[in-house]
């Protein structure tokens, strides 16, 4: 009976509160990122084996150029995250594009550092500085997209 009341209460809150729905969506996006970066990984014996990481879309393997999309994936992964964070907490941050870009970059950087530290401590994947950089870039792009949508909504 107690769990049924709790579920009804949460459902009612979900229907009534826009902020609660946005927070739920942010939790969903965050869980997708954590699944991709932490839960869906193999154990590594030495998580510090490639600290610098890949800084481009081409890497040399055994003298052969190979296309890698890791940097693009890191950028794309953080774009929706930071856009949803800005959408959820936009009223607290304000509409100034400088503030939005600063906060979206800062939040993406802190979230990325947290993921990399967890990968290091749990030995899931490798700690890479390039991941932190590209995730932060993705966060700023997400902030830019949020700014563009906010500006476009004024004219619609």
Residue positions per predicted region:
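Hydrophobic alpha-helical segments of small multi-pass membrane proteins
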Residues: 135-136
């Amino acid at each position: 009976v107690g769990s049924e009341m709790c579920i009804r209460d949460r459902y009612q809150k979900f229907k009534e509160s826009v902020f609660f729905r946005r927070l739920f969506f942010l939790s969903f996006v965050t869980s997708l990122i954590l699944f991709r970066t932490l839960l869906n990984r193999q154990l590594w014996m030495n998580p510090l084996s490639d600290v610098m990481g890949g800084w481009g879309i081409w890497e040399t393997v055994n003298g052969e150029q190979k296309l890698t999309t890791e940097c693009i994936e890191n950028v794309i992964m953080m774009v929706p995250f930071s856009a949803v964070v800005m959408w959820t907490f936009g009223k607290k941050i304000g509409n100034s594009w400088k503030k939005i870009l600063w906060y979206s970059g800062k939040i993406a950087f802190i979230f990325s550092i947290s993921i990399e530290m967890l990968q290091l401590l749990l030995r899931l994947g490798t700690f890479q500085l390039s991941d932190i950089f590209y995730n932060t870039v993705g966060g700023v792009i997400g902030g830019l997209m949020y700014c563009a949508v906010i500006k476009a909504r004024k004219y619609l």
